[in-house]
Amino acid sequence: MLRIAKEALTFDDVLLVPAHSTVLPNTADLSTQLTKTIRLNIPMLSAAMDTVTEARLAIALAQEGGIGFIHKNMSIERQAEEVRRVKKHESGVVTDPQTVLPTTTLREVKELTERNGFAGYPVVTEENELVGIITGRDVRFVTDLNQPVSVYMTPKERLVTVREGEAREVVLAKMHEKRVEKALVVDDEFHLIGMITVKDFQKAERKPNACKDEQGRLRVGAAVGAGAGNEERVDALVAAGVDVLLIDSSHGHSEGVLQRIRETRAKYPDLQIIGGNVATAAGARALAEAGCSAVKVGIGPGSICTTRIVTGVGVPQITAVADAVEALEGTGIPVIADGGIRFSGDIAKAIAAGASAVMVGSMLAGTEESPGEIELYQGRSYKSYRGMGSLGAMSKGSSDRYFQSDNAADKLVPEGIEGRVAYKGRLKEIIHQQMGGLRSCMGLTGCGTIDELRTKAEFVRISGAGIQESHVHDVTITKESPNYRLGS
């Protein structure tokens, strides 16, 4: 007898039922819990894939209210540096600003500027006492780069200094009065504590919805493998200030993965850890018991994933999410739906099935901010996109995600493909369209918050004819819509 557990459904098998509503789409609250302690302003995460998320995309997504996960197909030092780039991009108060000594040469300062991408450095003594600041304006026309900083720096008498905790309005007024772009935070002994820049104030005003930590820095996540030898990578990422760690595997309900989570939790009791991927209630429970702060669901739904075809294993995504959510009821541990999201309606369906947020790859892979070059093919612009189970990605370092250790291409068994997606422009436009669709869903279903959508919205199951009727039919599309693309 066939051991068939049950029937399982995915996004195209269901629709949400409209309900009486007092909710206007533009008043819907899209904020949600990523973990018990991290709140997002939109329920969107970017996948930890080498053609999707590095610092540039993570910054752009955090500014829109979501969070990006830096992929691990790079050296430990580089991944930690990518995390630092995000954390320092928009800092509020930079608590550990890079400083120079009065004896530092201008040539060394120039090298620092080229490496870091910014030109203002507080000048401190060996005892961390503030004596001045050197900026790009101070040295713009200097030709002798062997001179020490002390010759050209702005001395401390002319600096704008503030005490810790000073009101934003006071700081801005002082900066405006002296016509400067940087204010230095000092204690009573004039020791440097931090630095505030006008640019950070401007960025905060431009992006009020940004996802930030308590210190006003953008939030960022990073992925690590579950295999042995990843301890050093975890330590480096924690030291770099990562907000949430993703212990990433194609099969999270595996003893090796669970053990890695237990060990990481024991070493870092307060670190936010996401574990995955699973597709069953038992898998979700196992991750929660191992110490996960959130559980990621999805075995094989992604556009570039061939796991279900190569292995014959997987659970359609709506059922997988609903089962995981039911298993974690009462624990306060959120579920993340990872993969298979093609339209904003799929985001709404995943959340209505119980997910607190969705992780997307192909949706963001063709954006300006994603890694990789724009390619021209038959007159259209594309960007490359590949699964972390593809031969190319596995030979670069992601093979441990699929429990394979031999990096010779002819010995690897891929569970993903390499392809291309249409170039989509800037990430913020994609987010605007996707979140706009989600807001419209919340208006139609009468759900004012993500939590209400998770718990109140009802589904109907539809037939093949129902999905055919739902899509564009009996017409030729002459102008592409920004939120509806079939194929690529």
Curated annotation (Swiss-Prot):
Active site: C305 (thioimidate intermediate), R401 (proton acceptor)
Annotated InterPro entries: Aldolase_TIM, CBS_dom, CBS_dom_sf, IMP_DH, IMP_DH/GMP_Rdtase_CS, IMP_DH_GMPRt
Residues recorded with modification N6-acetyllysine: K267, K428
Domain CBS: 93-149, 153-214
Chain positions recorded as NAD(+) binding sites: D248, S249, S250, G298, I299, G300
Keyword Amino-acid biosynthesis: no
Cofactor: K(+)
Pathway(s) it belongs to: Purine metabolism; XMP biosynthesis via de novo pathway; XMP from IMP: step 1/1
Catalytic activity: IMP + NAD(+) + H2O = XMP + NADH + H(+)
Positions contributing to K(+) binding: G300, G302, C305, E469, S470, H471
Function: Catalyzes the conversion of inosine 5'-phosphate (IMP) to xanthosine 5'-phosphate (XMP), the first committed and rate-limiting step in the de novo synthesis of guanine nucleotides, and therefore plays an important role in the regulation of cell growth.
Family the UniProt entry places it in: Belongs to the IMPDH/GMPR family.
Protein name: Inosine-5'-monophosphate dehydrogenase
